[in-house]
Amino acid sequence: PEKAASQITADDFYEIFWEIDRDSMQSYLDEHPQTLANGWAGININESGLNQSGTSIRTTMGEQVLAVNFREKVLLVRVAGEKYRGVLAVAKVPARLSVEMSEGLGSYGQTVGEIAEAHGGLLSMTCNGFLDPGGQGNGGDLAGFAMSDGVAYGAHYTYTDDFPYARFEILTDNTVCIRRSDEEVRADCRDATEF
């Protein structure tokens, strides 16, 4: 059984967010004591805005933490390498992951924010691309294969050595697998996107 919010301890917090470096988190809490005003279960730090520089909290691998929300079980981390930079979203409840389609699929597209809002999403990202003939596409024609709540859309990308497309599948038991685009979609797949 789940603990009541008032019973959540620091150890409970770090059991879920094991990626967070405890010393840097404690330093942040020392500087921002209001963070614990509602206990460990009430932690909701968000310094991920475009005009914000993130927190002083680090992961155990040294990445900067941008946001952590205990209730939603989400962690945002700034990641960077020689040829990339971005934000890694760590969602601790895989049952909440889903692929959602534009309401105008086949006619027009929507922004990722509009799709997320329509489906009660907390975090969102684009999945499949869309066909854009002559740069005149409107986002309504799906590129590649996708599945949303067990309903398949589009056609699979052709897998070649030069273009090794893959498919991200979320299964009905809420596990995730990545498969080649030329492999059959698993029978227990509920959501998928190809890239």
Where are these regions (language model features)?
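Zymogen propeptides
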Residues: P1-T160, R167, T175-C177
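A substrate-binding/cap region within the structured catalytic cores of diverse enzymes
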Residues: A155-F195
